[in-house]
Amino acid sequence: MWNLNDSPDHHEESDSRGNPVGHVSNGMSQSATWLPFVLPVTRNFFPAQSMEPGVRWSGFNSVGKSDPSGSGRPEEPEISPPIKKSRRGPRSRSSQYRGVTFYRRTGRWESHIWDCGKQVYLGGFDTAHAAARAYDRAAIKFRGVDADINFDIEDYLDDLKQMGNLTKEEFMHVLRRQSTGFPRGSSKYRGVTLHKCGRWESRLGQFLNKKYVYLGLFDTEIEAARAYDKAAIKCNGKDAVTNFDPKVYEEEEDLSSETTRNGHNLGLSLGESSSEEFRLKSDIASIRSRIRDEERLLGSDLSLAMMTTTVRSEKQQSDGGGNRVVGMAASSGFSPQPSPYRIPRTFHFSRP
């Protein structure tokens, strides 16, 4: 033990067991002799820092699989083929078809499709099958023939021709018109609506900065649709969207052009004859004007003669010797003066 006041003792002190300090007991010696055999075992679990990191895990590769060769190089991971992302979306919970959902409030099967991050309404239908076909048509129009659809692409070969002439918006309107949820009073044909009077109204929308152009009322729905088609062709030409095949109107236009050409030729021939008639009429008019002038002159002469005879008769009645006086006045060259108290009567003869 150490003496804090004095210098430490130089004699050897013994521990509680009687062994001197600094002496190693048998237990420690045994552990010391066993320690060299334990170190190699601990080095396997905790390798020294001098070892390379690749050597530590020589028996394992990067994916956790053992390397049978023991070369220490990790095996290349297997590259799985890329999964094709489906653009058709998940199946509907209420229908077996894609893009079809049943709505209890309306009692109809409604069809929707996603385009550019927005859900587009395609219409409401009475059956899920009709709604699924509407979805397929829209998917083919928006995404091409490789789109995921409910039925075979062969069922829509006839629709592909119509899709090429329509834009997305126009094709959506076509699908909505074919649906059951389209408003009442409307027609399945483009540009045709049922008027209040019971006839079908045809009008062309958004033309020349106008909301619509009124085309008229028709007795049948087809006549109104044909009127719309003709107006659309005149405004937009070959790019016009029509209800029926534009070739039908081309044939009608050819027939109308031939009729117009024939009518023009007939008008020319009639024009020649009409010019001759005009000459005759002008000649007759000139002759009649001459006759009127002659009759006017003749009538003035006759009226003057009648007036003269009337004055003479009145003079004879007023004067007893009126004949002798009138005769003398006439022989002398002076015309008889009418009586100031009597107004002479004038006679006008009408033209025969």
From Swiss-Prot:
What Gene Ontology molecular function terms does this protein carry? DNA binding; DNA-binding transcription factor activity
The protein's job, in short, is: Probably acts as a transcriptional activator. Binds to the GCC-box pathogenesis-related promoter element. May be involved in the regulation of gene expression by stress factors and by components of stress signal transduction pathways. May regulate negatively the transition to flowering time and confers flowering time delay.
Q: Where in the cell is it found?
A: Nucleus
- Residue numbers of the DNA-binding region are 96-152, 188-245
Q: Where is the composition biased (Basic and acidic residues)?
A: 7-16
Q: Which UniProt keywords apply?
A: Activator, DNA-binding, Ethylene signaling pathway, Nucleus, Repeat, Transcription, Transcription regulation
Any Gene Ontology biological process: ethylene-activated signaling pathway
Asked whether the UniProt record includes Acetylation among its keywords, one would answer no
| Cellular component GO terms, alphabetical | nucleus
Which parts of the sequence are annotated with region: Disordered? 1-27, 57-96, 312-352
Known SUPFAM superfamilies for this protein?
Answer: DNA-binding domain (SSF54171)
* Protein name, as recorded: AP2-like ethylene-responsive transcription factor TOE3
Q: What induces this one?
A: Repressed by miR172a-2/EAT.
Family, per entry: Belongs to the AP2/ERF transcription factor family. AP2 subfamily.
User: According to the entry, what is the taxonomic lineage of the organism?
Assistant: Eukaryota, Viridiplantae, Streptophyta, Embryophyta, Tracheophyta
- Alphabetical list of InterPro entries matching this protein: AP2/ERF_dom, AP2/ERF_dom_sf, DNA-bd_dom_sf
